[in-house]
A protein has these predicted regions:
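Bacterial Sec-dependent N-terminal signal peptides
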Residues: 1-29
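Mature catalytic domains of secreted/periplasmic carbohydrate-active enzymes
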Residues: 26-299
Length: 299
């Protein structure tokens, strides 16, 4: 009996040791920046160009009902757009994000999928702003990036009960933007709050864009669903997948956390802060705000 007891105890000890070994937590592998994220971080400083229908309506947001003819750029619009890029480079900026389509749905390029764009027959000076800015960026060595509003207050398919109709419209337009204007370094989505997160099919859209521009860094505004001051390491990513975090117009806090989770997996997400140069916080140009801009050291 003693021998049997001894063997029993030895066997139990061996099994317990195996269990402890198997269950011990592996060393945490903290996510690090990808090549694309590091390139974005290294650019550091850029210009966010808000231009479009709202510029000529003198508003921040419009509802997509203004006639296309409201958009009335000058004949030398292409030269002016190239000038924006030159000024950005002169100021030390390494990237430019252009609002190719804001919430009103008006497109700054000639899209095959809508007449609510710069090529509308009622517009006299049909300048492809996306081409003018992207060409200048490539010439000047400035990284070209695209803002595209998910929310579209003009496009009829957006109002349909079948949400996939608009997703296809959106993918068609994104294909134009990703294949006609050279390298696109960032894709900045906005307006996701107007629908349920799952209605955007973000994984599908993300994969679609990456198939054309593998190194393009993609994110959706309000990525984490919190202001930067409230973000904590390990918070859930609301708009997944995303390559970086957005929440305009706030600055990151000291010791800004970079690690966030989705379905239990950790991801490294740098924060891109966007700030207006307007004292009153306007994104688009307004005549009444033309003389009151912030200097470089004004908070």
């Amino acid at each position: 009996m003693r021998r049997l007891t001894y063997i029993y105890k030895t066997a139990c000890s061996f099994c317990l040791g195996a269990m402890l070994y198997a269950c011990s937590a592996p060393e945490r592998q903290v996510p690090q920046p990808t090549k694309g994220q590091q390139a974005m971080i290294d650019r550091k400083y850029g210009m966010f160009l808000h231009f479009g229908m709202n510029t000529y309506l003198n508003v921040e947001w419009s509802d997509g009902t203004a006639p296309a003819s409201t958009y009335a750029p000058p004949a030398d619009m292409a030269e002016k757009a190239a000038g924006w890029v030159k000024n950005a480079k002169r100021a030390g900026m390494r990237s430019i994000v252009l609002t190719t389509k804001h919430h009103d749905g008006f497109c700054l390029w000639d899209s095959k999928y809508t007449e609510y764009d710069i090529a509308n027959p009622t517009i006299e000076n049909k300048v492809d702003i996306v081409k003018a800015v992207s060409d200048a960026c490539h010439k000047e060595g400035v990284a070209f990036s695209v803002y595209y509003s998910l929310w579209d207050r003009h496009e009829l398919s957006y109002q349909k009960s079948d949400k996939r109709l608009y997703i296809q419209y959106m993918k068609n337009q994104l294909q134009e933007l990703m294949t006609q204007y050279g390298t696109v370094h960032e894709l900045w989505f906005d307006g996701a709050w107007d629908r349920k997160t799952e209605d955007w099919h973000l994984q599908e859209v993300y994969d679609f864009v990456k198939s054309m521009q593998p190194d393009c860094q993609i994110s959706t505004n309000w990525t984490i669903g919190k202001r930067p001051v409230d973000m904590q390491e390990g918070d859930s990513i609301i708009y997944f997948p995303s390559d970086f975090r957005l929440w305009d117009p706030f600055l990151p806090v000291k010791d800004d956390p970079k690690i966030y989770k989705h379905n239990g997996k950790e991801y490294y997400l740098p924060f891109e802060s966007t700030q207006t140069i307007s004292v009153i916080g306007s994104w688009f140009n307004h005549p009444e705000d033309s003389t009151i801009h912030k200097h470089a050291f004004q908070k």
